[in-house]
Swiss-Prot record:
Function, in words: Probably phosphorylates lipids; the in vivo substrate is unknown.
Name of the protein described by the UniProt record: Probable lipid kinase YegS
Keyword Cytoplasm carried by entry: yes
Superkingdom assignment: Bacteria
An annotated GO BP: phospholipid biosynthetic process
InterPro entries (UniProt xref): ATP-NAD_kinase_N (IPR017438), Diacylglycerol/lipid_kinase (IPR005218), Diacylglycerol_kinase_cat_dom (IPR001206), Lip_kinase_YegS (IPR022433), Lipid_Phosphate_FormReg (IPR050187), NAD/diacylglycerol_kinase_sf (IPR016064), YegS/DAGK_C (IPR045540)
Family: Belongs to the diacylglycerol/lipid kinase family. YegS lipid kinase subfamily.
């Protein structure tokens, strides 16, 4: 078989007992591939392992986990300086795997691993919030954010992405919109939002298509605001034709500014960030990612 450069897998500690993954790695090693494996234990491990990966001279750093793990690894990669920065590979092992699913990463471990190692590396965008925190997939605010951050771990482990819908339905009686003002390029809106989605990717919360028109290499962020009483169809993903729906506000811009009279929380690839003022901007072609040739999120 063809020779491939070495790669380093950064594996979320929750997946250390994944026997099928261990077998898939061993088989690829027997085929001649060099795959280093490092396991995360605490915040900051991913950045340290990316630094180690550069010293090892690997061509790819594979994020093995959910959206949070992909976020940590990709953030560490875009902070690297100099030449020969490794590409990002994706091995979906989380609860929802929203980003991996939307870009077409195979569910089968062996196929996902081979793609992460040998797939074409394509330049994609990332987004940055307040010049500090980054996200590769989506920033979500409002009721949807509270659901994804409050859903019990045991429920997520048992039911996967469906758990977010179930927990959301259980919490319908606590619905409270977030009042805010949002500005962007040729965009201005002010009002009460039940759900805010600002996407580099398209889906969040276990498969909810919040920003269905988003692309990861167009230099733009897609915005979708759900107002009124549209939270239920948003949660169960049964929104019918919404082109003329007055409860859905859409926009596209390379940046958005959000101001709120009270503290609101955004979920950035699974990590909550609270405040009253947010500046979210796109970082064009921020890193290279190994993606399938038919990735639907590429222009």
């Amino acid at each position: 078989m063809a020779e491939f450069p070495a790669s380093l897998l950064i594996l979320n500690g929750k997946s250390t007992d994944n026997l099928p993954l261990r077998e898939a790695i061993m088989l690829l090693r027997e085929e001649g591939m060099t795959i280093h494996v490092r396991v995360t234990w605490e915040k900051g491990d991913a950045a340290r392992y990316v630094e180690e990966a550069r010293k090892l001279g690997v061509a790819t750093v594979i994020a093995g986990g959910g959206d949070g793990t992909i976020n940590e690894v990709s953030t560490a990669l875009i902070q690297c300086e100099g030449d020969d920065i490794p590409a990002l590979g994706i091995l979906p092992l989380g609860t929802a795997n929203d980003f991996a699913t939307s870009v077409g990463i195979p569910e089968a471990l062996d196929k996902a691993l081979k793609l992460a190692i040998a797939g074409n590396a394509i330049a994609i965008d990332m987004a940055q919030v307040n010049k500090q925190t980054c996200f590769i997939n989506m920033a979500t605010g409002g009721f949807g954010t509270r659901i994804t951050t409050e859903t019990p771990e045991k429920l997520k482990a048992a039911l996967g992405g469906v758990s977010y819908i179930i927990h959301g339905l259980m919490r319908m009686d606590t619905l409270q919109p977030d009042r805010c003002e949002i500005r962007g390029e040729n965009f201005h809106w002010q009002g009460d939002a039940l759900v805010i989605g600002i996407g580099n990717g398209r889906q969040a919360g276990g498969g909810q298509q919040l920003c269905p028109n988003a692309l990861i290499n167009d230099g733009l962020l897609q915005l979708r605001i759900f107002t009124g009483d549209e939270i239920l169809p948003a949660l169960v993903s049964t929104l019918k034709s919404d082109e003329d729906n007055p409860n859905i506000i859409e926009g596209a811009s390379s940046w958005f500014d959000i101001q709120a009279p009270h503290e609101i929380t955004f979920n950035l690839d699974g990590e909550p960030l609270s405040g009253q003022n947010f500046h979210i901007e796109i970082l064009p072609a921020a890193l290279r990612c190994r993606l399938p040739p038919d990735c639907p999120l590429l222009r």
